[in-house]
Amino acid sequence: MTFTRLGSIQNMRIKIHCDASSNNQEDKISSTEGRVLLMENTESRKVNLFCWKAKKITSICRLVRGAETRALENGIDESIYFARMIHEIYSGKVDLKNPKQIQVKTATDNKSLWENLNNSRQCDEKLLRNSIALVKEMVERCEVETVDWVETLNMLADTLTKSGGSALWIKSVMEQNEL
């Protein structure tokens, strides 16, 4: 694993890949979430992978979209925390009433989740509506720049949630510091 200089804070953002697998734990009803966080220079596109996590989702998810939604919500929460902490480190200022942060850009490979976030229709699964509304609100408040859809082949967190996921792409990112 190598790290590269990313330059000034004005050109930095956190990029997060969130993924989930439904009903893949030993009990066959619990799901797994995974996330990979990168610091990215928005001009040079150079990245440093600095955090990854895989864990059991605490609530039972009926569908894959539910697991993906909860994984995205948890990943965004962690990303905003790091984005604010990085801004505090670089600026030397802490403002708890109006916290500043670097940009956060997210990625999911679940097309139906992405569609729910980018249209005005309500989600069919009523228990997910609050989570989807929260993510939409974070985008409106500019806590999250965008939620992008990526193909599963380009999902860095895929290897953290599935036994057959390929780790070649994430290995390449770690070695070359490029997406």
Regions found by a protein language model. Name each.
Residues 58-179:
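RNase H-like nuclease module associated with reverse transcription
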Residues 10-27, 72, 109:
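Two-metal-ion RNase H-like nuclease active-site motif
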Residues 9-15, 48, 96-105:
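Glycine-rich, flexible loop segments associated with nucleotide phosphate handling
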